[in-house]
Regions:
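Membrane-proximal intracellular helices of multi-pass ion channels
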Residues: 1-445
Length: 445
């Protein structure tokens, strides 16, 4: 029988990305299981360690164990590093290690880096990675320095560690906090609801981390000359501004009637910023009106911007869907923005991503509701928080059974790796149809 020669198969860059995230999550879970990771020196059950590690790497912030009271300083440090790796991306972090060690980056590694941060080209990718790493560390350091006086006033020298942790958590849009205690767990930033320093610094870190690395580069190179920015940066900044101001006005008039002028404005602004994948909260979310919860679900699904520390289906996806609707109203064949025509394939990708997120959101929420016997609205809120990698909760996540927590783990993972990355990793382009079939039309609407 003749020998068959099998061609050696290599992992694609997209497969490397999704397996890289999975590997870091599993490694983090094993470390968090160790007695040294818990404050009481006990072994943490695997499913709870896995949930925490997934939430950290996927920069979500949903927790089943209070971060401030359950985990030791070692465990909290592990969580912070997992957040940093997840925020920058597994590939970006690994590349940063290569850059710092002075090792050469291969063409395959450069291609993987390009796909990891959705860079338009391979050229200059190492320089961009270096810019991202330096910018991240500088911004997180500045954020921590601003918060140190407040936290040191309340917690003494421990406030330095808390400032660093919360700065990393906010910049990476993770939403983990250390403010819970054994008697009052899962409190987030509610004790700082009227503190302007903490509110403003956390909001700025969330926004800067969520607008994307390429937008940073545009601002760095062109300063505040908006007309010189790339179209993507223009779309991101415009959409981000609208998604902050409009919901803030809504929250201002809809909720927080118990707060006075400036404090009410601060709470409304914070509540508009944090659902876009950050996960911090300064007020009790269970007390919000149904309309406010619905608004937050929409914001959680939209998320941050491409090539950023944030998750969700992304601001550009949402903007392109709206622009497509606008083009239909105007009876235009092309979707345009800022004097440029947008490729039809990009619109198709945006529609695909949006459908994936909405399907995962509804399927996850309904499954949890049926299994747990909880109100559908509450379960949809948790599902949106998971798939949008946000971390906001109505308080039911720690009380869910293991199966429901596994569903949230899957949603967090899929929400972080991204719709297109998952599609390109699973489905080969060999299935791409080479010949074009006859054109036909279907009546819609």
């Amino acid at each position: 029988m003749p020998w068959r020669i099998h061609k050696k198969r290599h992992l694609t860059s997209f497969q490397v990305i999704i397996l890289g995230f999975a590997g870091v999550i599993l490694f983090g879970a094993l470390i968090l299981m160790l007695p040294i990771s818990s404050a009481q020196g006990i072994i943490t059950p695997f499913h709870k360690a896995l949930f925490t590690s997934t939430s950290a790497v996927c920069v979500t912030g949903l927790v089943v164990l209070d971060t401030g009271s359950y985990w030791s300083v070692f465990g909290q440090t592990v969580i912070m590093f997992l957040i940093q790796i997840g925020g920058l991306g597994v590939i970006t972090t690994a590349t940063s290690v290569f850059i710092l060690s002075g090792r050469k980056i291969s063409i395959m590694q450069r291609s993987t880096m390009q796909n990891a941060i959705s860079a338009p080209k391979v050229g200059g990718i190492v320089r961009l990675m270096s810019f991202i790493l330096k910018g991240t560390l500088l911004i997180e350091l500045i954020g921590a320095l601003f918060m140190i006086p407040v936290f040191c006033h309340d917690f003494g020298l421990r406030g330095i560690w808390m400032s660093i942790f919360h700065s990393v958590s906010a910049f990476c849009n993770a939403g983990f906090d250390l403010l819970g205690t054994k008697w009052h767990p899962f409190v987030s930033l509610t004790s700082y609801a009227v503190n302007p320093v903490i509110n403003i610094v956390i909001m700025l870190l969330i926004i800067i981390g969520g607008i994307g690395f390429f937008t940073w580069e545009d601002i760095y190179l062109h300063k505040f000359h908006f007309k010189h920015y790339h179209m993507q940066s223009k779309v991101i900044l415009t959409t981000t501004l609208c998604l902050i101001l409009l919901p803030a006005v809504f929250f201002f008039f809809q909720d927080y009637g118990n707060l006075s002028g400036i404090h009410r404005l601060l709470a409304a602004l914070f509540q508009a910023v944090t659902p876009r994948t950050a996960g911090f909260n300064t007020t009790d979310l269970s007390m919000l009106t149904g309309a406010s919860k619905a608004m937050m679900i929409l914001l959680m699904l939209i998320g941050g911007s491409p090539s950023s520390t944030a998750g969700g289906m992304k601001t550009t996806t949402f903007a392109l869907l709206l622009l497509n609707v606008l083009a239909t109203f105007q009876r235009c064949d092309d979707v345009t923005a800022f004097g440029r025509r947008i490729d039809a394939s990009v619109i198709k990708n945006a529609t695909t991503i949006a459908m994936m997120y909405f399907i995962l959101f509804f399927a996850g929420g309904m499954t949890i509701s049926v299994y747990e016997g909880l109100p559908l609205s509450s379960c949809l809120f948790e599902a949106a928080s998971a798939v949008g990698t946000v971390g906001l909760t109505l308080g039911i996540t720690p009380k869910l059974h293991i199966l429901s927590q596994i569903i949230l783990i899957i949603l967090m993972y899929l929400g972080r790796v991204g719709g297109l990355t998952l599609i390109y990793a699973v489905f080969s382009d060999k299935n791409k149809r080479k010949a074009r079939l006859p054109l036909d039309k279907i009546i819609v609407g």
